[in-house]
Amino acid sequence: MQWGRILTAMVTPFTADGKLDLDGARRLAAYLVDHGSDGLVVAGTTGESPTLTHEEKIALFREVKKAVGDRAAVIAGTGTNSTAASIELSREAEALGVDGLMLVVPYYNRPSQEGLYQHFKAIAAATTLPIILYNIPSRTGRNMDAATTLRLAEIKNIKAVKEASGDLDQATAILRQAPADFLVYSGDDSLTLPLMAVGGYGIISVVAHVAGEKMQAMVRAFTAGDVQGAAALHRELFPLFKALFITSNPVPVKEALQMLGLPAGPVRLPLVGATREEKEKIAAALKETGLL
């Protein structure tokens, strides 16, 4: 299993009238792989998974995998708040030849820690693919405790967690006791370097859409022992770390992609596009980092 350290949580391109833009998805996927992404996560939070149909997700998994082939890992976002539905989608994704699955903590129904364990255990038993768990309590309404993550890490095909809790202590607690081959990815671009400093593996990134090569340079500097160089790149990227999250993700990154002439299109309701003030801040951050 070689996913790489920078996985981009890819946006889902739409046409001006809100239809799925598969040609745009293929072109964007190829661009991202050519510009610093080791792999792509498809139909996750940044991919607007709540407003994608089952059929659209399947089409995205198929076409993105075709577009990048063996050049990069394609991780399918198949987690939902229904265990049965997640199993069905995961099996279909596996049949399409994706390289792994990302499973979000079930949202809205607020399961207990035991419920979370049983949910992920059941999905893992239904697939042979390696799995990334995805903990994002700000969106799901339920934090997956470190103890639960550690229980799940003992399951042979659960290989990683995307920790988007923003809690470095929680990530550290996982890293202290997890199996040696269990990977902890940051779910927050701005915490990539701090998390790697305590043993994290990499980032499932939004910012890599527009600054993948700079993100890659930061990670490579750190892993080569050039901590000062990595820190300098972190500071250089800081305006983007903030500007691309000034309103609900993926609204800002889609605006940034459009400014750079890359496939993105609008967001789907109930999300709405950035305000004029937000667009100005996004453009300013792109200019400050030499991208626009």
UniProtKB/Swiss-Prot annotation:
UniProt keyword Calcium, yes or no: no
Binding sites annotated in the UniProt record for pyruvate: T46, I204
Active-site feature positions: Y134, K162
One annotated GO biological process: diaminopimelate biosynthetic process
Catalytic activity: L-aspartate 4-semialdehyde + pyruvate = (2S,4S)-4-hydroxy-2,3,4,5-tetrahydrodipicolinate + H2O + H(+)
Cited InterPro entries: Aldolase_TIM, DapA, DapA-like, Schiff_base-form_aldolases_AS, Schiff_base-form_aldolases_CS
EC number: 4.3.3.7
Residues the record marks as site: Part of a proton relay during catalysis: T45, Y108
GO MF annotation, one: 4-hydroxy-tetrahydrodipicolinate synthase activity
GO CC terms in record: cytosol
Pfam family, one: DHDPS
Enzyme class, first EC level, given as a word: lyase
Cytoplasm among keywords: yes
Main location: cytoplasm
Pathway(s) served: Amino-acid biosynthesis; L-lysine biosynthesis via DAP pathway; (S)-tetrahydrodipicolinate from L-aspartate: step 3/4
Record keywords, A-Z: Amino-acid biosynthesis, Cytoplasm, Diaminopimelate biosynthesis, Lyase, Lysine biosynthesis, Schiff base
Location of this chain's protein in the cell: Cytoplasm
Purpose: Catalyzes the condensation of (S)-aspartate-beta-semialdehyde [(S)-ASA] and pyruvate to 4-hydroxy-tetrahydrodipicolinate (HTPA).
Family named by the database record: Belongs to the DapA family.
Subunit structure: Homotetramer; dimer of dimers.
Protein name as catalogued: 4-hydroxy-tetrahydrodipicolinate synthase
Organism: Moorella thermoacetica (strain ATCC 39073 / JCM 9320)
Lineage: Bacteria, Bacillati, Bacillota, Clostridia, Moorellales
Gene name, Swiss-Prot/TrEMBL: dapA
